[in-house]
């Protein structure tokens, strides 16, 4: 039985949403942002790679001869469909269904940035020997710390349509690179 690219794309979408709601229901805590980032960095690329792999191998078993363009398309289209539907659904959920989850993610993002700034400051302070350098570091640290003032971060929103568009553009680069790999690896080589 041959599955078309839309079927594989929809299966990738379903798997992505299962992961998203799994984290939402079971990981909605003080580490929600970090858990989401780890899954986006490690689990989701593996999931999309498997979806593309099964799409290409299923097609190759059916037709036997496959060129670069066919293999590329069979890898890219399911990832694009699954990714687009997932991005749209997650955007709609965070912006219209549960805005508290969006607020929590935004807050945890800002707190993470603040913690990283403090860690860098403490490391740099230990390394510097000259008093002038330490004073300059303290001055820059205090300036940067001002950007985390509550009135400046209260309207910070990482989940705008614009940011989702930028993120999806970056993900499309991943899809293109991965599809190029699949197209090169799974095409039939002909000797002329």
Regions found by a protein language model. Give the residues of each.
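Individual transmembrane alpha-helix segments
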Residues: 140-173
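Hydrophobic secretory-pathway targeting helix
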Residues: 41, 57-61, 68-98
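Functional transmembrane-helix hotspots
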Residues: 89-131
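Juxtamembrane interface at the cytosolic side of transmembrane helices
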Residues: 2, 60, 70, 174-192
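Membrane-interfacial segments
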Residues: 26-34, 55-63, 93, 97-101, ...
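Alpha-helical transmembrane segments of multipass membrane proteins
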Residues: 15-23, 47-48, 82-90, 174, ...
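Transmembrane alpha-helical insertion/packing segments
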Residues: 1-65
């Amino acid at each position: 039985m041959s599955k078309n690219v839309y079927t594989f794309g929809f299966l990738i979408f379903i798997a992505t949403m299962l992961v998203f709601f799994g984290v939402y229901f079971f990981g909605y805590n003080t580490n929600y942002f970090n858990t989401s980032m780890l899954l986006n960095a490690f689990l989701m690329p593996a999931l999309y790679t498997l979806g593309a792999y099964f799409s290409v191998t299923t097609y190759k078993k059916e037709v036997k001869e496959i060129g670069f363009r066919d293999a590329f398309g069979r890898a890219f289209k399911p990832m694009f469909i699954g990714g687009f539907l997932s991005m749209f659904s997650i955007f709609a959920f965070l912006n219209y269904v549960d805005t508290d989850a969006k607020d929590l993610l935004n807050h945890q993002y800002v707190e993470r940035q603040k913690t990283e700034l403090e860690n860098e400051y403490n490391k740099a302070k230990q390394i510097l020997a000259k008093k002038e350098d330490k004073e300059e570091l303290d001055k820059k640290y205090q300036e940067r710390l001002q950007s985390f003032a509550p009135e400046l971060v209260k309207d910070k929103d990482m989940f705008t349509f614009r940011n989702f568009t930028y993120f999806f553009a970056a993900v499309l680069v991943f899809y293109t690179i991965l599809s190029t790999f699949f197209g090169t690896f799974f095409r039939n080589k002909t000797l002329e």
